[in-house]
């Protein structure tokens, strides 16, 4: 009886020892394989040139700085392009498949189907209130209207440049613009802006700080206003804050993933006269207009030349980015 128990215990111990030996052998074999594999990777890594998708690139300085992809594929094979156009274009074309047609035409220029996005807007005024530019490259078509030249110029200035903005509390504080790059940008359904310049004693210059009727009116019932006043002078402001938001903004530099294309018009809009626009922008262009099909054909034909004057952004943005640069 005791012999059977001893045999059972001995068998169990031998089994444990054998299992331990097998596990240690497997561990040594796996270590050998892993270390050999890592050694091969270390030896070959200087000769490999591939994209590392695991790196989160830091955004410092200008957000328009392009990061070069080490694999250097053609830009249109890995990018998205947004085309913004007035709704009247789709109304005139009157073809349910016109976007598919254009997508196939863009494909002949190297842009794969699915990389082109079409976004319509009602008019310049409504687009300026909530511009959303989400693609790697954004082309904004603006049909020329002699009555909206100022709105078009201000919208182009807003889209083609990057702004760092902060809120303004006009009920408590006076504000001044420090230099030419410092502007006050207002957006809303109806923006009426009045200003009263102040002297060193905070008394109004040509106006009474207690009477807004004596303030100089610089904008009336507009949806987008970029206000420029005399630098280095304090101002008291009066703004229709119930329908408008005003921000204190600094122009940082070009927003290089956006191009504005003026459609038609005898006069050519130009924002390069602004001394803060440096270098002179090449991303504001004009095409002739007869029919919208002709306009889109022209865009397709020259899309790659247009993109060459632009730089791909590192992330998307919406109208909030014009107020807060994060």
UniProtKB/Swiss-Prot annotation:
Residues 1-50 form the signal peptide. Gene3D superfamilies: Glycoprotein VP7, domain 1, Rotavirus outer-layer protein VP7, domain 2. It is found in: Virion; Host endoplasmic reticulum lumen. Residues 165-167 are annotated as: CNP motif. Residues 253-255 are annotated as: GPR motif. Pfam families: VP7. Its main location: virion. The keyword NADP does not apply. Glycans are attached at residues 69, 238. InterPro entries: VP7 (IPR001963), VP7_1 (IPR042207), VP7_2 (IPR042210). Disulfide bonds join 82-135, 165-249, 191-244, 196-207. It comes from the Viruses. Ca(2+) 2 binds at residues 177, 228-229, 231, 301. The keyword Transcription does not apply. Ca(2+) 1 binds at residues 95, 206, 214, 216. N-glycosylated. GO terms for molecular function: metal ion binding. Keywords: Calcium, Capsid protein, Disulfide bond, Glycoprotein, Host endoplasmic reticulum, Host-virus interaction, Metal-binding, Outer capsid protein, Signal, T=13 icosahedral capsid protein, Virion. GO terms for cellular component: host cell endoplasmic reticulum lumen; T=13 icosahedral viral capsid; viral outer capsid. Calcium-binding protein that interacts with rotavirus cell receptors once the initial attachment by VP4 has been achieved. Rotavirus attachment and entry into the host cell probably involves multiple sequential contacts between the outer capsid proteins VP4 and VP7, and the cell receptors. Following entry into the host cell, low intracellular or intravesicular Ca(2+) concentration probably causes the calcium-stabilized VP7 trimers to dissociate from the virion. This step is probably necessary for the membrane-disrupting entry step and the release of VP4, which is locked onto the virion by VP7. Some rotavirus strains are neuraminidase-sensitive and require sialic acid to attach to the cell surface. Some rotavirus strains are integrin-dependent. Some rotavirus strains depend on ganglioside for their entry into the host cell. Hsp70 also seems to be involved in the entry of some strains. Belongs to the rotavirus VP7 family. Homotrimer; disulfide-linked. 2 Ca(2+) ions bound at each subunit interface in the trimer hold the trimer together. Interacts with the intermediate capsid protein VP6. Interacts with the outer capsid protein VP5*. This is Outer capsid glycoprotein VP7. It comes from Rotavirus A (strain RVA/Human/Japan/AU-1/1982/G3P3[9]) (RV-A). The lineage of its organism: Viruses, Riboviria, Orthornavirae, Duplornaviricota, Resentoviricetes.
